């Protein structure tokens, strides 16, 4: 780069414009997504994939959460990956899909928002942020078609409407504002079922956090690529709150307490049964023949 500008800066650094992405595309294109060599097909286990993320509204903002597992094919690649990030002071992004590319996208998105605010002297509107993320996703389309998708959730506090808002995306960059709740990733079909049953209008923050955890528990129960809370290693899902005060993570202590409470409740709700042959009960009891078994819930046993 030739240095010909005033004060010894290269001309590119003095070019007008508030978009860091446009600047990088012109002066350092190799750092941009989608500039690396491509292939006709890419094995599914070539890179770690993040799995399940959820977000939901509560009466004063948004709760956004993600499990901690990344997989490579049938292998657990990481047990403590982070999938929920602050985009700026009043918005958040959660990622599912190809982990390395998604984390790179998050960093570029954070830098893009920061660069815009420094140049313009004011932050982008929430709709502007959501649209900018959509544009960035569209540049990844060819990689998504080769098996390396990125599917984020974006959420933030809208200072104009004085409310939290949720945005879901597809791999083409399509942007969809979602009322109430949304989810993405391999366990999203199970998480969505839990959210449908549990979400109610005007939730408080504590209940909304519990519902997000319940949705991830249900997803982990049926999807091998989604991790539930790891009680032995004390690894919990990551959850963040976005409201008029800004972005903040839920503390480890609060997550541990909430997960322990859910585990206790579910263990109490689980009904164990025993199969007994009439007249014979004990360690030596053999399996009964068809038609002779009696199912006795433990709660009914004396």
Curated annotation (Swiss-Prot):
Record note on quaternary structure: The 20S proteasome core is composed of 14 alpha and 14 beta subunits that assemble into four stacked heptameric rings, resulting in a barrel-shaped structure. The two inner rings, each composed of seven catalytic beta subunits, are sandwiched by two outer rings, each composed of seven alpha subunits. The catalytic chamber with the active sites is on the inside of the barrel. Has a gated structure, the ends of the cylinder being occluded by the N-termini of the alpha-subunits. Is capped by the proteasome-associated ATPase, ARC.
E.C. numbers: 3.4.25.1
One GO BP annotation of this record: proteasomal protein catabolic process
Job description of the protein: Component of the proteasome core, a large protease complex with broad specificity involved in protein degradation.
NCBIfam families in the record: 20S_bact_beta
Catalytic activity: Cleavage of peptide bonds with very broad specificity
Catalytic site: 51
Residue ranges, annotated region (Disordered): 277-302
GO-annotated cellular components: cytoplasm; proteasome core complex, beta-subunit complex
Any GO molecular function: threonine-type endopeptidase activity
Removed propeptide positions: 1-50
This protein's name: Proteasome subunit beta
Enzyme class: hydrolase
Bias-annotated ranges (Polar residues): 287-302
InterPro entries, A to Z: Ntn_hydrolases_N, Proteasome_sua/b, Proteasome_suB-type, PSB_actinobac
Cross-referenced SUPFAM superfamilies: N-terminal nucleophile aminohydrolases (Ntn hydrolases)
């Amino acid at each position: 780069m030739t240095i010909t500008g005033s004060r010894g800066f290269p001309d590119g650094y003095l070019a007008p414009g508030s978009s860091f992405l446009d600047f990088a595309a012109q002066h350092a294109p190799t750092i941009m997504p989608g500039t690396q060599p491509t292939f006709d097909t890419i094995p599914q286990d070539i890179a770690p994939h993040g799995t399940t993320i959820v977000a939901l509204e509560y009466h004063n903002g948004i709760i956004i959460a993600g499990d901690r597992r990344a997989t490579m094919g049938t292998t657990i690649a990481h047990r403590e990956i982070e999938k929920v990030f602050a985009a700026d002071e009043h918005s958040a992004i959660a990622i599912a899909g190809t982990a390395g590319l998604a984390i790179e996208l998050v960093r570029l998105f954070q830098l893009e928002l920061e660069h815009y605010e420094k140049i313009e002297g004011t932050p982008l509107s929430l709709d502007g942020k959501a649209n900018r993320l959509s544009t960035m996703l569209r540049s990844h389309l060819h990689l998504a078609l080769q098996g390396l998708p990125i599917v984020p959730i974006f959420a933030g506090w809208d200072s104009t409407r004085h409310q939290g808002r949720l945005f879901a995306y597809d791999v083409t960059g399509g942007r969809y504002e979602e009322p109430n709740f949304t989810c993405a990733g391999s366990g999203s079909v199970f998480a969505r079922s839990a959210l449908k049953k549990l979400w109610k209008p005007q939730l408080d923050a504590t209940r909304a956090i519990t519902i997000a955890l319940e949705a991830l528990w249900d997803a982990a129960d049926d999807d091998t690529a989604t991790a539930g809370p790891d009680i032995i290693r004390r690894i919990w899902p990551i959850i963040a709150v976005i409201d008029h005060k800004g972005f903040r993570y839920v503390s480890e202590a609060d997550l541990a307490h909430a997960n322990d409470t859910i585990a206790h409740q579910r263990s109490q709700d689980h009904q164990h049964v025993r199969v007994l042959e009439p007249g014979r009960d004990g360690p030596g009891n053999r399996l009964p023949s068809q038609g002779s078994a009696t199912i006795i819930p433990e709660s009914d046993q004396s």
